[in-house]
Amino acid sequence: MAFKFENTGERPRTVHHLCEVQETSLLELQLQCVYCKKELSSSEVYNFACKDLRLVYREDSPYAVCNFCLLFYSKVRKIRHYNYSLYGASLVALTKKELFDLLIRCYRCQQPLTPEEKQLHCEYKKRFHRISRTWTGLCLQCWRHTTSTETAV
């Protein structure tokens, strides 16, 4: 069943909140990709929820993003909207916040980085990147799948 949310103030922003409003489970939730319009599989809906990504609305209907489009448009975003890079200590000095208090997402898959992943960036002297007004780095899963030159942006 397709829900419409005409009142912008009442629109659920997360998949979990949408499940509550629609009184359905995460596995039964049906969402389309905002880019390719394909229906997301149950595992893609679950991944979207685990990455704590936000729903977007088109014509008052909620949309998410499929795994293929997420990786593709993350790459496009990295290329088009890269600003600059900083090491962990410089990022702490600039923001006046500890790394653990900053929301830093993986620039490849958009997963929020764990405190351990942020610490690894510091230990291995990998930089964090400012891409489209957001701090990014690499999660462990994507770290394994990328080459060392790719982290230099």
UniProtKB/Swiss-Prot annotation:
Cross-referenced InterPro entries: E6, E6_sf
Transcription listed as a keyword: yes
Entry keyword annotation includes Transcription regulation: yes
Superkingdom to which the source organism belongs: Viruses
Zinc finger (unnamed): 33-69, 106-142
GO biological process, one term: DNA-templated transcription
Motif (PDZ-binding domain): 151-153
Keyword annotations from UniProtKB, A to Z: Activator, DNA-binding, Early protein, Host cytoplasm, Host nucleus, Host-virus interaction, Inhibition of host innate immune response by virus, Inhibition of host IRF3 by virus, Inhibition of host RLR pathway by virus, Metal-binding, Modulation of host cell apoptosis by virus, Oncogene, Transcription, Transcription regulation, Viral immunoevasion, Zinc, Zinc-finger
Gene Ontology cellular-component terms listed: host cell cytoplasm; host cell nucleus
Locations listed in the record: Host cytoplasm; Host nucleus
SUPFAM superfamilies: E6 C-terminal domain-like
Molecular function via GO: DNA binding; PDZ domain binding; zinc ion binding
Record note on quaternary structure: Forms homodimers. Interacts with ubiquitin-protein ligase UBE3A/E6-AP and thus forms a complex with human TP53. Interacts with human NFX1 and MAGI3. Interacts with human IRF3; this interaction inhibits the establishment of antiviral state. Interacts with human TYK2; this interaction inhibits JAK-STAT activation by interferon alpha. Interacts with host DLG1; this interaction leads to the proteasomal degradation of DLG1.
Family the UniProt entry places it in: Belongs to the papillomaviridae E6 protein family.
Functional note: Plays a major role in the induction and maintenance of cellular transformation. Acts mainly as an oncoprotein by stimulating the destruction of many host cell key regulatory proteins. E6 associates with host UBE3A/E6-AP ubiquitin-protein ligase, and inactivates tumor suppressors TP53 and TP73 by targeting them to the 26S proteasome for degradation. In turn, DNA damage and chromosomal instabilities increase and lead to cell proliferation and cancer development.
Record's miscellaneous remark: Belongs to the high risk human alphapapillomavirus family. The cancer-causing human papillomavirus E6 protein has a unique carboxy terminal PDZ domain containing substrate.
HAMAP family: HPV_E6
Descriptive protein name: Protein E6
Organism name: Human papillomavirus 30
Source taxonomy: Viruses, Monodnaviria, Shotokuvirae, Cossaviricota, Papovaviricetes
Gene: E6
